[in-house]
Amino acid sequence: MKRAVVLLVALACHRGSDDPKADAPSSCVIEHDGGVTQCFEDVGATAKQYGSKYCDEMHGRHTYFPAKPCPREGVLASCTKKPGTDLERVERCYRDEPGCAARCEKAGGTYQK
């Protein structure tokens, strides 16, 4: 029990660090035909931990940005998957809105236009 309390205090101190990027999401930007088509924003701690590996497995031209959210300009829709968990990830769609909606439904995510 004492170890659990020490761990919780340590985690609270880490989250309250002076680094403004500590809680920032990471992102994986995917481009086709000269423009951004999709971006995956890793919000949860576990999602951030594996974000770079996940991004490397994407097709097409992809770039991983630690501690930098997806671009907001040009977003047609988004899909939040596993909200409020360590695995929370948001897919932002810049083209092919119907495809985005279908992927979101299949993943059981929350779709927003």
Residue ranges of each PLM-predicted region?
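Extracellular/cell-surface secretome signature
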Residues: 22-113
